[in-house]
């Protein structure tokens, strides 16, 4: 061996994992919308400067994202005209609270796809989906925070 180079050897035990395959049930969501992955990543990053939780409100008129904390508060109102695609059950209003840290991590992968799809229903996990093309996608599910 040359000077400054060290011989390294490793021994690692084989690991057997027990696993259970999880089935993702088909859910009819009350609201579904698509936004620019880059824009939503920037919005979530900015929102995380103000609070730990994000409140998502969806109605037939608009979508709003808001948070508040010791640093202040921030609200983003997204007009329906600015959304790539949007559908909501007529008359439905959805208000859900999520951990901003988790959503931020899920939406930081904005280079995977130009748009990100969100699917929501009251008291159901939110689905965040990136279309990778060729019938491939990455989906994240995050449960809403429950009120005590």
Model-derived regions, located:
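Structural preference for solvent-exposed beta-strand-turn elements
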Residues: 1-148
């Amino acid at each position: 061996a040359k000077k400054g180079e060290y011989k390294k050897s490793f021994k690692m035990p084989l690991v057997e994992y027990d696993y259970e395959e999880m089935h993702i049930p088909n859910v009819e969501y009350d609201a579904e919308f698509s936004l620019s992955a880059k824009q939503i990543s920037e919005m979530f990053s900015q929102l995380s400067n103000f609070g730990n939780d994000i409140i998502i409100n969806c109605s037939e008129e608009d979508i709003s994202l808001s948070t508040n904390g010791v640093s202040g508060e921030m609200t983003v109102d997204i007009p329906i005209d600015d959304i790539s695609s949007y559908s909501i059950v007529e008359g439905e209003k959805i208000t859900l609270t999520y951990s901003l840290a988790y959503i931020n991590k899920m939406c930081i992968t904005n280079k995977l796809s130009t748009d990100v799809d969100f699917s929501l229903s009251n008291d159901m996990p939110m689905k965040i989906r990136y279309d990778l093309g060729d019938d491939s996608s990455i989906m994240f599910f995050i449960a809403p925070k429950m009120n005590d």
